[in-house]
Amino acid sequence: MDRFQIGDEQLLRFYQLKTINPTHSWAQDSSKLNNEEATSNELGVETSFDILKDFKYGNQISIDKESRAYLNDESLSYIRDPLNGQEMSKELQHLPNDSMRLNYLVNSKQFNVKAFLRDMHKQDSFNDLNNSLDRLDSDIQDQSIHLKQLVGKNFTKYVKIKNKLDQIYKEFDEKTNEKNQCDSPKENQINVESLNKKVDEVIRTTTFKLKPLMDNYQKILNYQATKKFIELNKFYFNLPKSLKRCLTNNDFNEFIIEYSKGLTLRRRFNQSSDASQSLVIKRIWTQIENLLVTYKDLIWNSLINSNFNIDQPQETILSLFSKLLNLENFINNNQRESESGNKNTTSSSNENPILRWMSIKMNGFQNELNELSGHMISKIIHSQRLILQNNTNQDKSQGCVELSYYLKINQLFQIISDTGKDSEGLKSTVEPNKVNTISGTSYLNLNCQPSSQGLTDSPTIIEMWLLILKYINDLWKICDQFIEFWEHIEKFLDGTYQNSIINEKRKENILIGDSNIIESYQKSLILKEEQINEVRLKGEEFITSVSQNLISFFTSSQSSLPSSLKDSTGDITRSNKDSGSPLDYGFIPPNCNGLSCLRYLPKIVEPILKFSTELAQLNITTNGITICRNTLSTIINRCVGAISSTKLRDISNFYQLENWQVYETVTFSSKSQDSSKNLTFEYGVTQFPEIVTSFQEVSIKTTRDLLFAYEKLPIINGISVVSYPSKQLLTGIEIQQIISMEAVLEAILKNAAKDKDNPRNSHTILTLTNLQYFRECAFPNILQYFDDAFEWNLASKNLELFSLLSKMESSIFGNYLSDLKINLRDTLEEKFHEINWPMYTSNSFRVGDYIIEALMILIVVHSECFRIGPQLIHKILIETQIFIARYLFEAFKPYVGNLSNDGSLQIIVDLEFFQKVMGPLLEKDTEATLRACLQNCFQNDTNRLQKCINEINPIVSANLKRTAIQFAAFS
C-alpha cells in the first residue's frame, strides 16, 4: 500500500477541518472548536497537557527552552504578577529550582493556579482576588481576540501552503517510485522515509507551536467557569467573613441565620458530583465549622466566666442558655439530617449542658477555694515564723507582748459617751458614796462603735492580722459569688428558668412553625430527681470545704498551725481541753496583745457570720445548714476564748504600765461620822484604773457582740445559724470576767510588793487611792456594764472580789501605818527620854520637843497625802493620834508620883497643846486617853489637875500662837 495515498477524510481528521479547502477563519473552518465544550468537562486542568502524548519529547524541549529564556536573572526582573502588576523576582528567587518556578509563571505550560494563589496571594482578600480575576479575564480576552485575529488572518495561507506541500510530496513520491522501483527500490525507499520523517517533524513542530493558543483558550474557559461559579455562590464564599462579623458584633441570631443558609448550600453541593469543586467547598466549610466551634466556646466562656453580680441579671443567663440550647439543638438536627456522614461536622455533647455548666462552675469554686486557702495559710504561717524569730531574744511568756499601746486605749477605741461628763455620769452601786471623774470615764453604750485610730500592736503583728483579714475577706468573695451563682442554680432546680426558656421557644414555635422544637428543648432542660440530688450534694461539698478550711484554721494552736497547711480535712490534733493560754489559739498572731484581738477579731468574724448565714439560708441541704451552725459555734467560742485569754494575760502584766503619776482627780463624797454633814474630798489616781476600765468595757462589748450576733443576722425561711447563747456559756463568761477583775488586784499587789520595805512613799498613797477608786467606782460600773450587756445580775451578787479588795486596802494601809508608827515611836522615845521628869524645872514652859517632832511627822504625812489622797489624812491622823496618846499614857506610867512640880506642869502644857493643835481632828478616844494620862500623873487629884490646867492655859495659848503657821495644816 502506498504510504502517500491519504484520503480527504484522513486529512480532515488529522487537521481537524471541516473542508479540504478552507477559505474562512479558524473558528469557522476548524472542527475542533466545535466539540471543545463537549470535551472540556471530561478533561481537567491536570490532564490538559495529555492531548498530544506523542509530543512529550517536544514538551521537554520546550520546558528547557523556557527555563533558559525566562528563568535567568535578567529575565526574572521583567516578570510581573498578572494580578497586581508587581515584580515577582524576589518570590521566584526563593524557590529551589527552575521547574518549581515555572509553576508560578502564567505563560508557562506548568503554571499551577492553586500554588500561585496559595503562595503569591495568601494575604489577599476574596474581594482583592475577585477584582484581580476580573482584570486578568479582561486582559486574556483582549489577548485572545488579538490571537484569534492573527490566526484567522494567516490560517488560509498556512493551509494552502500545507496543501501545496502535500501535493508536491505526493508527486515526488509517485515519480520516485516509478523511476526507481526496478533499479534499487530499497535504497530509494530509505530516502523517502527520511523525507517523510522530516515532513512529520515539521508538522509536529507546527502543531506544537499552535498548542499554546489552544491551551490559553482552555484556560480562558476555566477562568470564566470559575468566576461564574464564584459569582453564583457568592454568599457561600463570603460566609466565613459574614460569620466573623456576627461574632465581632455579638449578633448571635444573625450568626445562626447565616449559618443555616450556608448549611443549605452545603447540602446542595454534596448532592453534586463535581469533584473539581468539592475541595474548595470542603475548605470553606471547615472554616465555617471552626467559627461555629468558636461561637459555642464563646457562649460557654460567657457562662463559665459569669460573676452573677448586678451587672449580669437573670435575663443574661437565660439569654446565654437559650443561645447555647439553640446551638446544641441546631447541631443535633444537622447530624440527623446529614446524609453524607461528614466526620468534620461539629458534634454536640451528649451531656446535659445545664448540668455540665453547673459542674464546671462548682469545680471552679472548689479549686479557687483550695488555691486561696493554701496560698494565704502559707503566707500567714510565714508571718507567724517571722514574729517568733523577732522575739527569740525576749521573754517567751510575757516580755514579747507590747503593752505600751494600752496607754492610748481611749484614742484607739473612742467609746466614751459625751453624756457621761455630768455629775450623774458615774454612780457607784455602793451607797452612800458617790464618785465621778473630773476628766471623764463614763458608761459605755452598747450601740457605740469604736473608732480605730493608730496601731494597736507592733507592725509585724498587725501585718499578720491583715493577712488573716485578707484571707477571710477573699474567702467571703468566693462564697458571695457562689451564693449568687446558687440562686441561679436553684431556679434551674425548681424549673423556673426552664419554664421561661420553654415559653420563649413556644413563641418562636408559633412564628417558625416547627412542631418538634419544644420536645427537643425539653429533653435538654428537664432535670431528673437524681440529677437534682447530685447537684445539691455538690453544693453541700462546697459548704463542707469552706467549713473544713475555717475549722482547720480556728481550731489550731500556735504550734499546730503550720500542720494545718498539710491537713486538708481540717482535723487538727489538739488537746481536749484548752489551758487558757494564748498559745492555744493559732489563729491570732503570737504574742499579740488584747487590743489587737479586740480590733481585728470582730472584723474577721463578721464576714464569716454573714456568708455562713447566707450559705445556710440557701437551704441546699439540711446537712449543709447543720455544718454552718457547728462551724460558727466553734469559731465564736474560739474567738471568745482568745479574747479572754489575752485579756487575762495582759491584765496580769498591767503593773508594768504604772508610771506613778496623777492622771486625773476624782471627787469623793461621804457623810461625816455623826452624819451631820457631807464631806467632800478630791483625790488623784493614776492612768491604771482608766486603762483597766476601758479595756474591760471594750472586751465586754466585743464578747457580747460575738455571742449575740443573731440580733444582727437576718432569718430567712426560718433558717438561723446563730442562736441565743446558752446559760452555761454565759456562766463561763461570768467566771472569766470575775477572774480578770481579780487579775487586776494581783497586778496591783505586784507593784505594792516592791515597796513593802519602804511603804511610806507616794507609790503607796497612789496605790491606796487606786484601790479606793476600783472599790467605789470602777469595779461597780464594770459589773453593771456586764449586767446590762448580758442581761445578767453580777453586780447584785456578794462577790468575794470586794472582800479581797478591802483586805488589800487594809493590808497596804496597815503596812503604811506600821512604818509611820515605828517612826513616831522612835521619835517619841528619843525625845521623851531626854527629859528628866523627876528633876525637871523650867521658867518658860515651851512645848516639849517630843510633841513638836511627833506633830511634825504628822505634818509631813499630811503634806504627802493632801495632794494625792486627802481622804487618807483623816484615817492616818486618827490612827496616829491614838497611837501617840497611848504611847504617852504608857510612857508616863513609871513617873506617876515621881514628877516634879514643873514636870507636872510641863506635861499639862504638852498634852493640852497636842489636843489644841489637833483641833477638830481630835478623836474622842485620843482625848480620853490623854485625860487618863494626866489623871495618872496627878494621881487622880482632879481638883489640882483642873486648877493647873486653868493656870497653864495662857502658856498653852502662847505656844499655839508661836507655832500657828507651823501647824496650820491641822486647823
Curated annotation (Swiss-Prot):
Residues 558-577 are annotated as: Disordered. The exocyst complex is composed of SEC3, SEC5, SEC6, SEC8, SEC10, SEC15, EXO70 and EXO84. Keywords: Coiled coil, Exocytosis, Phosphoprotein, Protein transport, Transport. This is Exocyst complex component SEC5. GO terms for cellular component: cell periphery; cellular bud neck; cellular bud tip; exocyst; incipient cellular bud site; mating projection tip; prospore membrane. Present with 3400 molecules/cell in log phase SD medium. The keyword Protein transport applies. The keyword Phosphoprotein applies. Residues 558-567 have a biased composition (Low complexity). The modification Phosphoserine is found at S184. It comes from Saccharomyces cerevisiae (strain ATCC 204508 / S288c). The lineage of its organism: Eukaryota, Fungi, Dikarya, Ascomycota, Saccharomycotina. Pfam families: Sec5 (PF15469). One of its GO terms (biological process) is exocyst assembly. Belongs to the SEC5 family. Residues 123-182 form a coiled coil. InterPro entries: EXOC2/Sec5, EXOC2/Sec5_N_dom. Component of the exocyst complex involved in the docking of exocytic vesicles with fusion sites on the plasma membrane.
